[in-house]
């Protein structure tokens, strides 16, 4: 029996795991590298060495999260606070689980982990010591331990000596639930949370992102109840200390626009905002790698080296990687510690209060302006709407826009009613004197996408304050304040109506989009806070 750093089998017995052969506690990167490449490993446990020095793994049939298999125990702790899938008008993934079924699932996972050699990783979620979660991850798979070591904040030796976990994640990816039908569940796989026991259970899915986004969902529950904003956004800071946060759904430019040589990165995906300022939840990045090239995204490409962990990429016989191959999944990924990126905030991923809050949308309808300045109520309205749209081809070759509305630009990870996140964000913004902007990185009446050059000039104008002093006019129907001119931006594109052959053409498309906004927002009118915000949206 080898016990590391005082972690005893008795401590694991408290979680229901018995007869542990060996505990590999907070393994070093070098040890994980050896473990992942152990030639005796088979199946999804096995890692493959690539020519870039990073290990690649296969996550099996699950190459993304499994939202239909997500459950939260409904008990006295959560009954009146959680945003439940079976209550109210809004649709979400927070399906209730009975305490009895939870005990059954816990028994399956603890049985799977008992009698095994286990990897235990203690890490922090949240860069602020006052509000961070101390999380203990328990798994029998070396690369899953590597994933959480990359993605969460790695404690110092001193912090580890006094580490007391306040959340436990037990990953039993190899076990499934044969009684799922009788229990009324979605499938034999499960990702379940218990806020009373402060525990997450994983069964059947090997996808690493379940641990990352699982803890994000928990921060999204715990922090807003303390008045702290919990945000699905990227964040950066200027040399002078001016902080900006960028909200946006996939494909809107969140990573591209927050990666700015003039500014340092705080983080790329999950942040909190408390009395001290904006802080990263994570200690790493989880970047998409499909069609990755050294020329287009040198920072991410250069981060793929020893200690990075690739998922579901195609590795050729000679160890080279085919980043263009999406045959396994389009959601190929790499996790790496944040210090693999050069231009970051050090030593801790946090900064002061944000003064600029940017909502990115890619409007394929061609209606919204490239930039507008939002009022406090409009800020809440557009935050709750979380709008973007893609162009999807139809069989006749016509490209029709497909709208997406995702509350708070991250509906899949919300644990409370969306209006609670909007209220906390606006309070934080008001206290900091922050201003919000809606930036359309999508299309206009010409049918072309707004150029990255123009969008970068708009972001620069927001960040250097010139947009705050610009004269504005109001776009009808959406009541958005648009600047009359901005340095470095073609004035003609600022008013979307100018990009159409006639104002009537814009009007027609605007009515279509306004109706979509109004219909979507109806789900928030079941609370007084939501109903009061209808006036801040479009009017037909």
From Swiss-Prot:
GO CC annotation terms, alphabetical: cytosol
Residues annotated to bind ATP: 213, 232, 248-256, 297, 333, 449-450, 455
Primary location: cytoplasm
Co-factor note (free text): Binds 1 Mn(2+) ion per subunit.
Pfam family, one: PEPCK_ATP
Assembly notes: Monomer.
GO molecular function: ATP binding; metal ion binding; phosphoenolpyruvate carboxykinase (ATP) activity
PROSITE patterns for this protein: PEPCK_ATP
PANTHER family for this protein: PHOSPHOENOLPYRUVATE CARBOXYKINASE (ATP) (PTHR30031:SF0), PHOSPHOENOLPYRUVATE CARBOXYKINASE ATP (PTHR30031)
Subcellular location: Cytoplasm
Lineage: superkingdom: Bacteria
Family note: Belongs to the phosphoenolpyruvate carboxykinase (ATP) family.
Residues that bind substrate: 65, 207, 213, 333
Pathway(s) this gene product operates in, as recorded in its UniProt entry: Carbohydrate biosynthesis; gluconeogenesis
Name of the gene this protein is made from: pckA
Source lineage: Bacteria, Pseudomonadati, Pseudomonadota, Gammaproteobacteria, Enterobacterales
Keywords: Acetylation, ATP-binding, Cytoplasm, Decarboxylase, Gluconeogenesis, Lyase, Manganese, Metal-binding, Nucleotide-binding
InterPro entries cross-referenced by the UniProt entry: PEP_carboxykinase_ATP, PEP_carboxykinase_C, PEP_carboxykinase_N, PEPCK_ATP_CS
Function description: Involved in the gluconeogenesis. Catalyzes the conversion of oxaloacetate (OAA) to phosphoenolpyruvate (PEP) through direct phosphoryl transfer between the nucleoside triphosphate and OAA.
Modified residues (N6-acetyllysine): 87, 523
Catalytic activity: oxaloacetate + ATP = phosphoenolpyruvate + ADP + CO2
Chain residues that bind Mn(2+): 213, 232, 269
EC number: 4.1.1.49
Protein name: Phosphoenolpyruvate carboxykinase (ATP)
GO biological process, one term: gluconeogenesis
Cofactor (UniProt): Mn(2+)
């Amino acid at each position: 029996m080898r016990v590391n750093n005082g972690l005893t089998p008795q401590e694991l017995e408290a979680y229901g795991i018995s007869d542990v052969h060996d505990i590999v506690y907070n393994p070093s990167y070098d040890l994980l590298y050896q473990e992942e490449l152990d030639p005796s490993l088979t199946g999804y446990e096995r890692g493959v060495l690539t020519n870039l020095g990073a290990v690649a793994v296969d996550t099996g049939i699950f190459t993304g999260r499994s939202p239909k298999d997500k459950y939260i125990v409904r008990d006295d702790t959560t009954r009146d606070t959680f945003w439940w899938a079976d209550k109210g008008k809004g649709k979400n993934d927070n399906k209730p689980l009975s305490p009895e079924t939870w005990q059954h699932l816990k028994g399956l996972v603890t049985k799977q982990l008992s009698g095994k050699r286990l990897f235990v990783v203690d890490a922090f979620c949240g860069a602020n010591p006052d509000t961070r979660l101390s999380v203990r991850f328990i798994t029998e798979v070396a690369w899953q331990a590597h994933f959480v070591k990359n993605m969460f904040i790695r404690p110092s030796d001193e912090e580890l000596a006094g580490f007391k976990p306040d959340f436990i994640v037990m990953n039993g990816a190899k076990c499934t639930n044969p009684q799922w039908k009788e229990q009324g569940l979605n499938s034999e796989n499960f990702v379940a949370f218990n806020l009373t026991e402060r525990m997450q259970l994983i069964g059947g899915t090997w996808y690493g992102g379940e641990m990352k986004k699982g803890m994000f969902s928990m921060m999204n529950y715990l922090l807003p109840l303390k008045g702290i904003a919990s945000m699905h956004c990227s964040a950066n800071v200027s040399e002078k200390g001016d902080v900006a946060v960028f909200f946006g759904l996939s494909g809107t430019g969140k990573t591209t626009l927050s990666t700015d040589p003039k500014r340092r990165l705080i983080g790329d995906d999950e942040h909190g905002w408390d009395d001290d300022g904006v802080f990263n939840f994570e200690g790493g990045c989880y970047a998409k790698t499909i069609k990755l090239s050294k020329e287009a995204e040198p920072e991410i490409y250069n981060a793929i080296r020893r200690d990075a962990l690739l998922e579901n990429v195609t590795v050729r016989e000679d160890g080279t990687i085919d980043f263009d191959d999406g045959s396994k999944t389009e959601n190929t990924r790499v996790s790496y510690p944040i210090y693999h990126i050069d231009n970051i905030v050090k030593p801790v991923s946090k900064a002061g209060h944000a003064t600029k809050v940017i909502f990115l949308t890619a409007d394929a309808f061609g209606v919204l302006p490239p930039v507008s300045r939002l009022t406090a109520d409009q800020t809440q309205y557009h935050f709750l709407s979380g709008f973007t749209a893609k162009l999807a081809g139809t069989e006749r070759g016509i490209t029709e826009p497909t709208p997406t509305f995702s509350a708070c630009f991250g509906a899949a990870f919300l644990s409370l009613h969306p209006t609670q996140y909007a209220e906390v964000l606006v309070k934080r913004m008001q206290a900091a004197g922050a201003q919000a902007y809606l930036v359309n990185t999508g299309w206009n009446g010409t049918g072309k996408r707004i150029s990255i050059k123009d969008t970068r000039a708009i972001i620069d104008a927001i960040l250097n304050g010139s947009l705050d002093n610009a004269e504005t006019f109001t776009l009808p129907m959406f009541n958005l304040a648009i600047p009359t001119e901005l340095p470095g931006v073609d004035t003609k594109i600022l008013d979307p109506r100018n990009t159409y052959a006639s104002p009537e053409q814009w009007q027609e498309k605007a009515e279509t989009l306004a109706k979509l906004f109004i219909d979507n927002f109806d789900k928030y009118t079941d609370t007084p806070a939501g109903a009061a915000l209808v006036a801040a949206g479009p009017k037909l």
